[in-house]
Structure formats: C-alpha cells, structure tokens
C-alpha cells in the first residue's frame, strides 16, 4: 500500500529530475530511463505517474507555469494599485528566479519547440500567451485607449519573450536587472505617450 502523500512527493522528485536531465542532455537526450536514473527510481514508476515522455514534459511545464502564475499573482498583489506598478510586477514575474535558472530556461526552450507539434503542449502555450496578454492589456487599458492598450500589451509581451529568449540563448546567467530595466523603460515610454 502506498504511503499517504507519496504521490505528490514522487511527482515533484521526477519533475526536478526532468529539469536537470533536460539541462544536461537536452530534450532529445531525455528519456524516461534517464529521468528515472537521475531520480534513482525505476522507469516503471516514471511511466506510472506520467505515462510517457510527452506526459512527463507536460507535467514539468505545468509545474513551471504554476510557478510563473504564482509569481505573477504574488507580485501583482504586492504592487500598488497603479497600472505602472502592476505592469512592472507582471514583467518582474516573468523574470522571476523560478523562471530564469538554467534548467528551467532550457526546459522552456524545449517546450516552445515541442508545442508546435504536440496539441497538449500547444494548449498550455496558448493559455500562457493569452494570460500574459490579458494581464498586460487590463493594466494598459487603465491608462490608454483600448486599441492602444492592445498594441502596448502585444509589444510588451513580445519584448518580455524576446529579452527572455536572448538571455536563454546567450549561454550566460540571465541578467535580470538589465531585462527589467529595458522592459520598464518601454512601459514608461508607452505610458508617457498617453500623458502627452
């Protein structure tokens, strides 16, 4: 009989092992067996919890996305009610420590690539994209006309993704301060235009 609570402990252990395996071997080198070996358990247990490699990647991405959404919620709550502060909070959440470690960044890159081919991953990517756009648009709409708010949200979302992607591909540790500075300058520029 399994121990109570062991399912979540084991799933977390396997997700951590997946992140580390993708970091070391890439997605193509990540197998149920390599994840099981890293977690020091049998391949059958990995199959039991996730079914196959696609199920394991989906669960890993859901974990990363939950961390992102939690960081976004936490930072938005801590921000002042002003749209500028809330926009900056959304940006900061996307560059949160939970999103910019080497293993997480490499897993994001693998996820983006696979989401073009796997419907379940495509749905996750779509939800994430829509959530970011919706959050940004809601804040910009408090300061800008609706059409301008939509353009601003699209532009800032593209900037966040671009800064993140350049950082991920650089091979160096992610420069969170530089990314925040650029994105926050862009927010200031957009909001200054509305005040003019």
UniProtKB/Swiss-Prot annotation:
One of its GO terms (biological process) is glycine betaine biosynthetic process from choline. Gene3D superfamilies: Tetracycline Repressor, domain 2. One of its GO terms (molecular function) is DNA-binding transcription factor activity. Pathway: Amine and polyamine biosynthesis; betaine biosynthesis via choline pathway [regulation]. PROSITE patterns: HTH_TETR_1 (PS01081), HTH_TETR_2 (PS50977). Keywords: DNA-binding, Repressor, Transcription, Transcription regulation. Residues 31-50 bind DNA. Residues 8-68 form the HTH tetR-type domain. Repressor involved in the biosynthesis of the osmoprotectant glycine betaine. It represses transcription of the choline transporter BetT and the genes of BetAB involved in the synthesis of glycine betaine. PANTHER family: HTH-TYPE TRANSCRIPTIONAL REGULATOR BETI, HTH-TYPE TRANSCRIPTIONAL REGULATOR RUTR. This is HTH-type transcriptional regulator BetI. The lineage of its organism: Bacteria, Pseudomonadati, Pseudomonadota, Betaproteobacteria, Burkholderiales. The gene is betI.
């Amino acid at each position: 009989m399994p121990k109570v609570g062991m399912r979540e402990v084991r799933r977390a252990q396997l997700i951590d092992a997946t992140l580390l395996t993708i970091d070391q071997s890439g997605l193509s080198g990540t197998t149920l067996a390599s994840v099981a070996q890293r977690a020091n358990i049998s391949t059958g247990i990995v199959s039991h919890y996730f079914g196959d490699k696609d199920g394991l990647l989906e669960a890993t991405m859901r974990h990363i996305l939950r961390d992102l959404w939690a960081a976004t919620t936490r930072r938005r709550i801590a921000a002042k009610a002003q749209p500028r502060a809330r926009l900056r909070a959304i940006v900061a959440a996307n560059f949160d420590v939970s999103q910019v470690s080497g293993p997480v960044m490499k897993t994001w890159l693998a996820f983006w690539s696979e989401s073009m081919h796997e419907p379940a991953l495509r749905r996750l990517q779509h939800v994430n994209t829509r959530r970011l756009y919706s959050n940004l648009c809601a804040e910009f709409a408090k300061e800008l006309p609706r059409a301008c708010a939509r353009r601003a949200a699209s532009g800032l979302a593209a900037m966040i993704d671009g800064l993140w992607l350049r950082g991920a591909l650089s091979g160096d540790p992610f420069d969170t301060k530089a990314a925040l500075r650029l994105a926050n300058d862009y927010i200031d520029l957009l909001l200054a235009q509305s005040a003019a």
